[in-house]
Amino acid sequence: MRIANIRLTKEEKKMKRTDQEKKKPSPGELVHIMIDRPMNSYHPEHKDLFYPVNYGYIEGIIAPDGEEQDVYVLGIDHPVKEFTGKVIAIIHRLNDVEDKWVAVPEDMTMTAQEIMEQVRFQEQYFETEIEMLE
């Protein structure tokens, strides 16, 4: 069996991004997130990548990478297994096919700068733009 290393062209990335925009959450939409990387844990494959925030996915929403939609959970100060909160932003990775959603407790707001300060630990490796939904 041969395994091919497939790279997306800029046009293919643009098409995937357009498809993903169709799945964009509504401002303040409530979502239920399954946490697979709790706050104060390490990435399962990249052992030196420490997660200072809770990070997980939304079951049933498939992102362009074929996996369930990834979400940063901000605004809580302890590890959790699940979380229900509102989506306030999308972090667009301009040099990758993935976008990350940002969720917070219902009564909370954050600025793009505050979001980037908390997700820089991982997003520093990508060219990103933050789209605020509120």
Name each model feature, range by range:
Residues I3-E134:
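Hydrophobic N-terminal alpha-helices or hydrophobic patches in metabolic proteins across all domains
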